[in-house]
Amino acid sequence: MARLRVYELAKQLDMDTKELLHELEELGIEVKSHMSFIDEETVNILLDIYKQTLDEEEDISLAKTREPSKEKTEAKKPPVHITEADLKLDKFAEKIKIPQNRIIQDFFMKGEILKPGQTISISLAKKIAKMYDVRLTFEEDETAVKEQPKLENPLDELKRQFEEIYQNNKDKLVNRPPVVTVMGHVDHGKTTLLDYIRKTRVAEKEEGGITQSVGAYQVIVNGKKITFIDTPGHEVFTEMRARGAQATDIVVLVVAADDGVMPQTIEAYNHAKSANVPIIVAINKIDKANANVDMTKQELVTKLNLIPEDWGGDTIVVPISARNGINVDTLLEMILLVAEMQDIRCIPDSPVRAVTIETRLDKGYGPVANAIVKDGVLKVGDYVVAGKVFGKVKALIDDKGKRLKEAEPSTPVMIVGFEELPDPHSIIYVVDSKEKALEIVEKVREIEARELRKKRQVKLEEILKRMQETEKRELKLILKADTVGSLQALQNAIAKLRTNEIDIDIVHSAVGAINSSDIMLASASEAIILGFRVKADNQASKLAESEGVQIKTYTIIYKLLEDLKAALEGMLEPEEVEEKTGYGEIKKAFKIHKYGNIAGVQMYDGYVDKSGFVRIYRNGALVFEGKIESLKHYQQDVNKVSAPQECGIKFQNFDDIKEGDELEFYIIKKIPRKLTIIEEEKQQI
């Protein structure tokens, strides 16, 4: 038996690749990933061990993982009382005694982004508490934060229900087929690849059936299904994501071996990276005479920072010919491998939701939605809601033209039965009845009408304001410029605006006019668009207005950098500097009934400010440092008294004053902090 990669050994043992990785770690066998090699001797030993005992070990492993959770639920602790002030992630974490970083990491592993110190809702607090088996009670007085059910979008409630279902039913999760989007530069072979896979892998249609465009199709590889979205490119991908309807699990980035990494390749990569979707690179056209796979790999490294696995990285790169089918089977196997490692799952018997790929008015069927089922089993006769539109499923038709009675997770179908045309890329939910569907739709329409003039704006000022709520802040930018030189100079200049408190994330940068793709990426990523010597085309301008994306264009780079620098400086926490204002001495201590002790003070130098602070020294030792409660000059309340005048002072929470005590007065000044741009950068531009 020769040496094997981890995933190859997992296949032989009929084990999950991730499970085998874990087992190898437990055995002290060092492997980095599923692509790591295991030597021949170790392979033989593992085969001897696991071929006989794998089933028993799995049973024991399951028993071990279930037992602690049972004990955990049985050991109930007293509830933690939560007030309005506790509804910040850092304070809430401290209150429930779970490290904030752990909460952020655990939610990130579930695909949810939390930021340090962010404000959290009561429902999110409950969700976090449930994850760690912490019981909560909430403040119920008039100052407590109360959710406003009348203003809440019912679609948000449906979304939360799915989050809770996933949280509370982890034991019911099962693997589902991955949904794949193919991206890449124009003419690099995206459509050719999709067509080849469809022709060679999709089962023959029913006799008399007509191939139906449902926006996606399924193939079977080694007995497992893969769903491909049939519209190549990143435009639909990002439009769906901007509307919260993420359907893609894996991105295949197609790069031509004779052309290398091109502008749209970079653009597509940035879209996928922004969505945190795993990427497999297919280097296409290797059958051409001028194909250069190594050059293409080098450009993947230098332009995209994607290091192929055979070069020591962790990016799966498969050289293929979509026209001739060379290595396409290997690509499909790699998709299944990544799907296994990503642990793509669903709850098949949960309530139903689906993601709309596209909608249209069909001559025969009326308003239809091409969709992919995400959870549950969609059935003919179900009542469905998609945004502000509802309907009853009259027919489900797959990509082979076959009518289905039901559609399982990851199945692409055309849904017939909507009363009106749903918004493209909306999420479809199944509800109990027509009455419930109508209730939801009416509420959504009412909310949309009310909020029509209050549409969310992704503006620099608003993003920076929201950033104040977090400890580590991030400003996302999309940069467009007229030339490569201008773009590089701009990137270098912005890189100098770095600070430990604010990260600048350049989501995407490219040469050329601002287009619709830029707008949708900005909307999905909550980024602003900065253009240097370029403008937005008409379509992009209209889309930016409807999406609430702010575009700022400049012809002078100094102005762009000054605006960005000023905005970032406004977000920096000011530096607190102590400034001494004066000195005095207590000449007399007066005790006033029901009020406390008042110090009769002679000012020797400078002044005392009522809003400032004081240090009291006795025989050279500090006995008090704090605030001034009241300041009087001849019975009059004043804000300031200067030397050589006398005054009466009451110190906040301190009455142990004595004649002869020396006083040092000071104020705290908040000095705005500055960012520094290296001057030579300006000269280069």
From Swiss-Prot:
Residues 209-213 are annotated as: G2. It holds the Pfam family IF2_N. Residues 60-79 are annotated as: Disordered. Residues 321-323 are annotated as: G5. Residues 284-287 are annotated as: G4. GO terms for molecular function: GTP binding; GTPase activity; translation initiation factor activity. Residues 64-79 have a biased composition (Basic and acidic residues). Belongs to the TRAFAC class translation factor GTPase superfamily. Classic translation factor GTPase family. IF-2 subfamily. This is Translation initiation factor IF-2. It comes from Fervidobacterium nodosum (strain ATCC 35602 / DSM 5306 / Rt17-B1).
